[in-house]
Amino acid sequence: MYPKMKNDLILRAAKGEEVERPPVWIMRQAGRYLPEYHKLRAKQSFFEMCQTPETACELTLQPVTRFKGLLDAAIIFSDILVIPQALGMQVVMLEQKGPHFPKPLVVPEDIDLLEKTPNISAKLGYVMDAISLTREKLDGQVPLMGFSGAPWTIMAYMIEGGGSKTFAKAKSWLFRYPEASHKLLKIITDATVSYLIQQVYAGAQLLQIFDSWAGELSPEDFTEYAYPYLVRICQEVKQHLKKKKRDEVPMIVFAKGAWYAIDQLCDSGYDVIGLDWTVSPKEAVRIRGNRRVTFQGNLDPNILYGTREIIEARTKEMIQDFGGGKQGYIINLGHGITPGVNPDDVRFFLEKCHQYGSA
């Protein structure tokens, strides 16, 4: 049994309960903007850090320790690309460039080279070990979040071989090989469902699905190639936990750039919808109507490079525009924090979230 929770604010907010203030955490809060991250990074490669439970645990705890009492969640230090690795693909992290697949998928026949039903607990056991260890070490300070990438985003990486400006290779699959695209998306979805369930068994108390490249799709293509798989993940994870008589775990979907899908996502079964900074909070609240869905976001991460006056003003305005945050709102950035941000400015932002969220 894990230690009793001292702060369950984000769990209550995610379920739509009224709270004393909106909880706050930051996407990529364990990462490159922290000097203590670089001390560990100097000793190990990126994926070695992910694969060493003690290191992943230490990295997860770094922001919680540094900003003691200011963050309302920890998110396990890992990467969305562990799923392609579990499916048998090689992924390396290149300095300054990001992820690189030496042998990306080129034609539909390449799907046959994948390990279609991998043993997730064997392949990604190190993530579960990191989650269990972190849950113990957190000692109930804040809930621990697990995560995965969304099928379309994972597929895009597997075909592009890394990030891309145009996603021409991945999108051409959708328009040249629609059947093979669905076949690949199904393989990724099945592995992801299994992976998320294992994370809950290991101790994850919330789950976030990152659809980082959702905004590359038109509304029609999102509806065909992204949305159904996001819904399946949510349904299958929740159904499995219910069947096993496990506590329900709130699920968050973050489809970056898919502002056109807010209405759709409000009906997707996810408890929380992450919004990026291109979305007007007031408009999102209007679209949601009286549906019991919590929003998460959505400050432009680059505002943290701004003056203290602007950080404060924009934070206050955001909380007010989401309705004050006492119900249906989790404060976050509209995307991951960037490496050049000064941790002191992060502390200032978090303090202002507490100040205006409690008002």
Swiss-Prot record:
Swiss-Prot/TrEMBL catalytic activity: uroporphyrinogen III + 4 H(+) = coproporphyrinogen III + 4 CO2; uroporphyrinogen I + 4 H(+) = coproporphyrinogen I + 4 CO2
CDD domains listed in its UniProt record: URO-D
EC number(s) given by UniProt: 4.1.1.37
Pathway stated in the Swiss-Prot or TrEMBL entry: Porphyrin-containing compound metabolism; protoporphyrin-IX biosynthesis; coproporphyrinogen-III from 5-aminolevulinate: step 4/4
Molecular function via GO: uroporphyrinogen decarboxylase activity
Pfam families: URO-D (PF01208)
InterPro entries: UROD/MetE-like_sf, Uroporphyrinogen_deCO2ase_HemE, Uroporphyrinogen_deCOase
SS bonds (residue pairs): none
UniProt subcellular location: Nucleus; Cytoplasm
Enzyme class: lyase
Job of this protein: Catalyzes the sequential decarboxylation of four acetate groups of uroporphyrinogen-III (octacarboxyporphyrin) to yield coproporphyrinogen-III (tetracarboxyporphyrin) with the formation of intermediate hepta-, hexa- and penta-carboxylate porphyrinogens in the heme biosynthesis pathway. Acts on a number of porphyrinogens, but only coproporphyrinogen III can ultimately be converted to heme.
NCBIfam families: hemE
Listed HAMAP family: URO_D
Protein name, entry field: Uroporphyrinogen decarboxylase
Provenance organism: Schizosaccharomyces pombe (strain 972 / ATCC 24843) (Fission yeast)
UniProt lineage: Eukaryota, Fungi, Dikarya, Ascomycota, Taphrinomycotina
